[in-house]
Amino acid sequence: MARSGLSEPPGRVAATSTHPRPTLRPGDTTVSTTPQDDTATTPLWRPDPARAATTTIAAFQQWAARHHGAPAEPLAPLADDPDGSLAAARYAALHAWSVADLDRFWTAVTGWFDVRFTTPPRGVLADPAMPGARWFPGARLNYAEHALRHADTAPDAPAILHLDETTTDPRPLSWAELRRQVGSLAAELRRLGIRPGDRVSAYLPNIPEAVVALLASAAVGAVWTSCAPDFGARSVLDRFQQIEPAVLFAVDGYRYGGKDHDRTEVVAELRRELPGLRAVVHVPVLGTPAPDGALRWDDLTGHPVARPEFEQLPFDHPLWVLYSSGTTGLPKAIVQSQGGILVEHLKQAGLHLDLGPQDRFLWYTSTGWMMWNFLVAGLLTGSTVVTYDGSPGHPGTGALWSVAARSGATVLGTSAAYVIACRKAGLHPGRDLDLSAVRCIGTTGSPLPPDGFRWIYDEVKHDVWLASVSGGTDVCSCFVGGVPTLPVHLGEIQAPCLGADVQSWDAAGKPVIGQVGELVVTQPLPSMPTGFWNDPEGTRYRESYFETFPGVWRHGDWITVTPRGTVVIHGRSDSTLNRQGVRMGSADIYEVVERLPEIRESLVIGLEEPGGGYWMPLFVVLSEGARLDDALRGRIRTVLRDQLSPRHVPDEVIAVPGIPHTLTGKRIEVPVKRLLAGAALDQAVNPGSVDDLGTLRFFEQLARERAADRTG
């Protein structure tokens, strides 16, 4: 996977940060709103030193120390480092080097992972200013070429294992067959007139055909974009009409929750409303024949092409367009580059998840979520990617654990919400299934609460590395996440990722430790957007990330960087709770409230009222058979007061029939706040961005009733 003996190319000029690094000074206070117990300083898990020494990141550090000036310190024996503080200091030194000397660090990454520049770069970071940083000027390469190069060394090994709700055993697709299908499809795309810069769209589930189509698109230099087939026509058109695709790959339907879902009418509407389409390719998941005028998948991928032709492209050539949730307007069409994604995903998958040819990489996702794009990155490291098309909770809540067992997954990724659902269902996957192959469990989507950490170690596996991560569609990667050589502490993400100059800033732009602040990134990352589609002046891009702190990426999350270097995510800062001048994270409230067995899900909103008042209601979805009476309201208030603070106690607790989510499953807070403030539904939210628009009707009606009470 990696190569050694590479020396640093000449002419690199180190980039240094102009922003201060946060350090703990005498007099600093440590304040955390995340519940911790008295054993918080004792790790839940420590990697065995022998295991840590064999990780890719450990080998990378030693190699980078010899060739690129990285700090080198040997791993401490377990007995000499009971709390993991020495390991943390070792990683902190590596991280500090990675952000203080961006040129050397990213040169080391490209050397270690043998990135193949057909035209070498003239430098690393030509312009570090954000927005607009320019990486590896003059370089030419191809993402798909790197994703398929393991076909040379392991042609018969599985590149993809696929499962769905109807299969017991995974269906393999070998590296050689994956490369052949990509080559055949890429040749057909060229025959259709697709050239670099043309857009290729997909309305596909998480199936091998989607991976083939993405890689074929990248091979010819087209710009990929995708939506999951559970998106309705309006949601898809809000995205695809922005970029005007020339090709649409589309399924006839999908299977979820034990049911077939026909999408032929949706696909017909997409064809009518996307006038720039030159071709529609039919992928028959449900086995229906291709509609009139559509091309058949098998006809395009059946040619005996030995090796694809890879277009050699500038480093910043667009690879794909991802989309924001679009809850309050048209989704942002986020453009990321071939080279930027390649080097960032090699770093993230290869170093932070420690993926290699020995691994089977399963992350539960859909093609409408950035984690699908990141799942494909497993191919870059030679890992076998496991695709699963179906519900994680069918036929029972623990279905995803069964998929992991049947596929032999070594790295399993899921959402924090799924972990909590399994805990509430009383599952024991470690007892009931063979999960011996699983060495790492990743979680993302929302902060994983301490109870989720405990449940994984109690009920899944006591010796497993739990990599809670946080990043965003905006960079298709993680800002903070897992490190295989570090301990895991209750309720905390292990560390900032290499090359990511993550800090927590107060309102004055001062770095803080042990206090809640804004998540900022003070230096560029290669996978940051090259821009937004149809934003030629970059106005919307700047407004999205760089208005609060000019030249610094503000991500929109509240975080605490702890004195030991771990990170706690408190929720979105754009839905801030602010009582009596104290900022609070909604995630902390959800974690405490949803421990109660009577509460299935919750939503908290802070609303400034006329006359200077502040109203903070807590909305709860009750578990089956539960009743919101005075006793339960009292218990909710008591646990919030005792485990957080009196400020976290809501003004009212209100039962609701459901909580609204984005199409990728995240709670919607800002549109609910707008509704409660009196905005009309069509002004508060983009209807096509919500999983169940009916859940918002309750809040709309509540706002009317409150307005009537005030005027009455």
State each model region's role.
Residues 3, 11-12, 21-25, 31, ...:
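Structural core segment of the AMP-binding/adenylate-forming
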Residues 205, 247-266, 287, 389-393, ...:
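Adenylate-forming
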Residues 202, 227-252, 267, 393, ...:
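AMP-binding/adenylate-forming catalytic core of the ANL superfamily
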Residues 279, 603-609, 617-621, 637-712:
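Conserved C-terminal "lid"/linker of ANL adenylate-forming enzymes
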Residues 342-360, 370-411, 425-427:
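Conserved AMP-binding/adenylation subdomain of ANL enzymes
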Residues 94-97, 144, 160-215, 232-237, ...:
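Conserved AMP-binding/adenylate-forming core of the ANL superfamily
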Residues 439-566, 572-576, 589:
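Conserved AMP-binding/adenylate-forming
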Residues 156-158, 282, 293-323, 330, ...:
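Conserved pre-ATP/AMP-binding loop-to-beta segment of ANL
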